[in-house]
From Swiss-Prot:
Coiled coil: none annotated. Belongs to the tstB family. Phomoidrides A and B (also known as CP-225,917 and CP-263,114) are potent inhibitors of Ras farnesyltransferase and squalene synthase. CP-225,917 and CP-263,114 inhibit Ras farnesyl transferase from rat brain with IC(50) values of 6 uM and 20 uoM, respectively. CP-225,917 inhibits squalene synthase with an IC(50) value of 43 uM and CP-263,114 with an IC(50) of 160 uM. Phosphatidylethanolamine-binding protein; part of the gene cluster that mediates the biosynthesis of the antihypercholesterolemic agents phomoidrides which are dimeric anhydrides. Within the pathway, phiB is not essential for dimerization and its function has still to be determined. The pathway begins with the highly reducing polyketide synthase phiA that catalyzes the formation of a C12-fatty acyl-ACP, starting from one acetate and 5 malonate units. The hydrolase phiM is involved in the release of the C12-fatty acyl chain from phiA. CDD domains: PEBP. Disulfide bonds: none annotated. This is Phomoidride biosynthesis cluster protein B.
Amino acid sequence: MSAILKLLEYCLGRLFYRRRGYDAQLFYKSAAFAKHSSPTIPITSPDCGKTGAILTTEYSKFGSGKIPQFTWPAAAPDVKEFLMLCEDPDAPMGHPNVHGIYCFIPPTVTSFGPTDLELIKEVDGVKVLESGYRVGKNRRNVVYIAPRPPLGHGPHRYLFELVALSEKLDPEGISKVPDKGEIEKAIEGKVASWGLWEATYESTWDRK
């Protein structure tokens, strides 16, 4: 990116700096989590560390753009399925920006990472992953949007929310590419517990 374009982006980033912090619209603030207001599943990242980490360029749009590797303890007996959702509440869009939605993760799984998002093929907008997980909708219609906050907009938070479900989702009961709102409704009455891993990333002048 040229210096002029960077300067323009920086100016816009500063102009819209206060457009951030849409925490009230986060996934875990939806009605489905009414009985589970706090995370109880401990999540860590062998790559990036504990929650509260600062992401390196490697995990951004300016690096490989891969999702961090995550691990968590074995699920309780009542857990029938997991799902994972990643979002940025600091995007200047008036609502959190969804970076990725992944459904139908088996209850025996205790890790999630880049290899789970390997794309085999795409048919009519439906992405087929090696892992078999269903990919939900984000604004770029890709498997995962790597962090790329506007220059000058300060650090953004990236929340990776793992949800343990007491009932499996019906594969035929949700869209082939479900969005966040649809998932929020689909999991009402099914949330057994959930975990949160959060990291920050800020675009800098020395990026490519």
